[in-house]
UniProtKB/Swiss-Prot annotation:
EC number(s) stated in the UniProt entry for this protein: 4.2.2.9
Summary of the function given for this chain in its UniProt record: Catalyzes the formation of unsaturated digalacturonates from polygalacturonate or short oligogalacturonates.
Gene responsible for this protein: pelW
Cofactors (names): Cu cation; Mn(2+); Ni(2+)
Any one Gene Ontology cellular component term annotated for this protein: cytoplasm
GO-annotated biological processes: pectin catabolic process
Signals that turn on the gene: By galacturonate and PGA, and inhibited by EDTA.
Localisation per UniProt entry: Cytoplasm
Family per record: Belongs to the polysaccharide lyase 2 family.
The name this protein goes by in its record: Pectate disaccharide-lyase
Species annotation: Dickeya dadantii (strain 3937) (Erwinia chrysanthemi (strain 3937))
Magnesium in keyword set: no
Gene Ontology molecular function, alphabetical: carbon-oxygen lyase activity, acting on polysaccharides; pectate disaccharide-lyase activity
Main location: cytoplasm
Pathway: Glycan metabolism; pectin degradation
Length: 543
């Protein structure tokens, strides 16, 4: 019995309104999301609310392609499955199954096992051709996509297993030094024995601050998806080698942490310099060597490594990676991994969290505060003259802390959660409200059986519902131009409803903000590199 179950009766009218809204959202996407010229079960990643035209990628050569990127529709699948669970009707699950089955039967590379999807590749909704930004060569990339493997495995177990084999095989360039990269080659033949490679640590803490030199960029956002996939593979096949490889890869990020502070790293290697460093500081390709050392080395010395930078977007390290690891541990408990996850979070916040301003200090992972530092030269991290400022602590950062506490009952985490919540409450619920914060508070209320936090979660859900539900769809606001299928809020709202209906454990966990496409895009006749999530979907309506 959940603290939320009483609400199922006392506020039934509100729950019914929310479910009606989610149903409207799903029906409108089904009505307008398919191709008009060549209807199939595939859906556009999003469409214009006024015209119902699909979101397109504008290529620099002048042609436009309506985007259907299955990797950017995994939260949509979670939404459909959650709706079937809560309403006890199969029609939503059937929609998810038909769409997934159609994709898996037609858009899988037989050689590599990889799907035609991801950060640099999608299916043209009208022609069904595989397309992608030319500058990215349509390579395979997943960065915190965390696909809904549980459901994909139900639809087609063999192709899901083959994908994970191909995913690891295509992204690990050299197993002897664990040289891996965010880009995978579709030309690499799938290896069914991919997890039988021998394992040895490539990071030696005694050599710190020196890290292995690799051609590939061992970014944590790319590594997280590999780790997550390996554990899913182990769960469905019983292959202990896959789980061992997932843990081994995560261990390299742990070994690369600062030995004094224990603060985490963005990657466990430094880019190998393969070409002479150019005079132009704006040429920041990784083959010129470590970009942080090049831009900041003269001032900061050995600590200036890409791995040690904690002054750019912290979501991959503090939200996305911990959420993936904690979801793994929910299914496959491992005390050592849990200790690693919690240590990374606690050590970071010990040094970087400013309670008074409720913000995160920009830092090197040796604990050196970079607040107000002015860049001396151009480079990978920004232009000369850039001044670093603290990052406001958004409510999203609370979700992994809550989930880590739920698995560990760690007193320090609980203290940190209470402190952050008190600071967020002072901002006011309207200002602090976000989908991930709603999820965090819902899970906290459920765990503590707290009527106070259950009521707070309910109030936040009402605020977010009014903010996001317009035109019969869940959108960023009534002023935004596009609906986006991978928006997590509808699925998060269903998580709250599931708690009210005692179906908490039956709905899929929400783990990610969704997928993206990244590459060259035509803007006013010129080519610019964009993310669709940062350039297309934030567009407002033109009145």
């Amino acid at each position: 019995m959940s603290i939320f179950t009483d609400l199922n009766t006392s506020r039934k009218w509100q729950i019914d309104q929310w479910l009606s809204a989610v149903n409207s959202h799903i029906e409108k996407i089904q009505q307008y999301g398919h191709s008009v010229v060549n209807p199939t079960p595939l859906l556009a990643d999003g469409f214009e609310i006024k015209t119902q035209s699909p979101v397109v990628w504008q290529f620099p050569d002048g042609h436009d392609a309506p985007i259907s990127n299955f990797a950017s529709q995994q939260n949509w699948l979670r939404l459909l499955i959650s709706m079937s669970v809560i309403t006890e009707t199969e029609k939503y699950r059937h929609l998810a199954f038909c769409q997934s089955e159609y994709f898996l039967n037609r858009f899988v590379d037989e050689n590599s096992g990889l799907f035609y999807w991801g950060g640099h590749r999608f299916i043209n909704l009208d022609t069904l051709a595989s397309e992608g930004p030319e500058s990215k060569s349509m390579v395979h990339e997943l960065k915190h996509h965390l696909p809904y493997y549980e459901f994909l495995h139900q639809v087609n177990p063999e192709k899901t297993r083959h994908f994970i084999q191909g995913f690891w095989n295509a992204h690990v360039e050299d197993w002897s030094c664990l040289d891996l990269g965010r880009h995978g080659d579709y030309a690499r033949q799938r290896d069914p024995d991919v997890f039988l490679h021998s394992r040895h640590d490539v990071v030696t803490p005694a050599n710190w601050p020196e890290l292995p030199l690799t051609k590939g960029l061992t970014f944590v956002n790319a590594g997280t998806d590999l780790i997550y996939a390996a554990f899913v593979y182990a769960r469905h096949t019983g292959d202990a080698h896959a789980a061992a490889w997932g843990k081994h890869l995560y261990r390299q990020y742990v070994l690369a942490r600062n030995p004094e502070t224990g603060m985490p790293v963005y990657q466990f290697s430094s880019p190998l310099q393969r070409q002479p460093v150019p005079a132009d500081d704006n040429q920041t390709q990784s083959w010129f060597g470590d970009r942080a050392q090049r831009q900041f080395g003269p001032e900061f010395g050995a600590i200036a490594r890409e791995a040690n930078v904690l002054f750019r977007d912290m979501r991959p390290l503090l939200i996305d990676n911990p959420l993936a690891m904690l979801d793994i541990l929910r299914h496959q408990p491992d005390a050592e991994i849990l200790t690693w996850v919690i240590a990374g979070l606690k050590n970071y916040y010990q040094y970087a969290y400013d309670v008074n301003s409720n913000s995160l200090r920009p830092m090197w992972n040796n604990g050196q505060d970079m607040t107000d530092y002015c860049f001396k030269r151009d480079g990978y991290y920004g232009k000369a003259g850039t001044v670093l400022k603290p990052f406001p602590l958004e409510g999203d950062y609370l979700l992994p802390l809550v989930r880590a506490w739920l698995l560990s009952d760690d007193d320090d985490l609980h203290t940190l959660i209470v402190t952050m919540l008190s600071r967020l409450e002072k901002q006011g619920i309207h200002q602090s409200a976000s989908p991930f914060l709603l999820l965090a508070i819902t899970e906290l209320a459920h765990a503590k059986q707290s009527a106070q936090w259950a009521e707070y979660a309910w109030q936040m859900a009402e605020i977010l519902f009014k903010r996001y539900f317009h035109h019969g769809l869940f959108v960023r606001s009534e002023h935004h131009r596009y609906v986006r299928l991978d928006d997590p809020f509808p699925a998060i709202l269903l998580t709250l409803i599931a708690a009210c209906r005692n179906k908490w454990s039956e709905v899929p966990a929400v783990l990610t903000q969704g997928g993206y496409i990244h590459g060259d895009y035509r803007i006013n006749g010129e080519s610019r590199v964009i993310y669709d999530t940062e350039f297309i979907y934030p567009e407002k309506l033109i009145h």
